[in-house]
Design a protein with these regions (language model features):
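Signature of Gram-negative outer-membrane beta-barrel scaffolds
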Residues: 1-69, 80-88, 172
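Transmembrane beta-barrel outer-membrane domains
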Residues: 9-15, 48-54, 93-97, 108, ...
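Transmembrane beta-barrel architecture of outer-membrane proteins
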Residues: 13-21, 54-60, 97-101, 152-158, ...
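Short beta-strand segments enriched in hydrophobic/aromatic residues
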Residues: 26, 38, 65, 77, ...
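Gram-negative outer-membrane beta-barrel transporters
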Residues: 28-29, 145-176
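Surface-exposed extracellular loop regions of Gram-negative outer-membrane beta-barrel proteins
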Residues: 62-106, 111-146
């Protein structure tokens, strides 16, 4: 009889990224922001390896209403490796998806006080969901399954203030 292999093993995760972004004035007061991040991710275990390469683009438009107020719309794709495992002990594939945001920003006192109010929608695939059962051969580690079609939407508010040059405060609130 052989006992199940323990998941307490020497796993190694490698991640390398490269990104670039630019902001272009299309016609004052309209600005275009474009960017991309390339990520190379690999996990090596005693029993298998998994590698994923992904480019996550970003695009945004900013319209300056006046010196203090601007409105914006943005899009970015999502690529987020995760550490959860399935019932066979293998790591789940990275979370992928899209993020959409529309907002209003203000800037006061030479940027010593800024605010942001935004609405957002996040669409994700491969999101880990607990199966409620342990992985066979583990020390009770819970198994997860990847779920597609997860959607989050809501509104967020952020307030940033520089009380002094060395003391800055941030307040943020999000409602899903």
């Amino acid at each position: 009889d052989r006992s199940p292999q323990s998941l307490a093993q020497d796993d190694t995760t490698h991640m390398k990224s490269l990104y670039a972004a630019t902001r272009v004035t299309l016609a004052d007061p309209l600005h275009l922001i474009l960017g991309a991040r390339y990520t190379k991710w690999r996990v090596d275990t005693l029993t298998y390896s998994m590698e994923k390469n992904h480019t996550t683009p970003y695009a945004g438009l900013v319209f300056d209403i006046n010196d203090n107020w601007s409105t914006y719309a943005s899009y970015t794709s999502i690529f987020q490796p995760q550490n959860d495992r399935d019932s066979s002990g293998k790591y789940l594939a990275p979370i992928t998806g899209n993020n959409y945001e529309l907002g209003l920003k203000s800037d006061w006192m030479n940027s010593r006080l800024t605010t942001t109010l935004a609405i957002f929608r996040i669409e994700q695939d491969n999101v880990a969901q607990s199966t409620g059962t342990p992985i066979p051969g583990s020390n009770g580690e819970t198994a997860y399954k990847a779920v597609d079609g997860t959607v989050s939407k809501g509104v967020e508010f952020e307030l940033n203030g520089a009380i002094t040059d060395n003391w800055q405060l941030t307040f943020g609130a999000t409602r899903y």
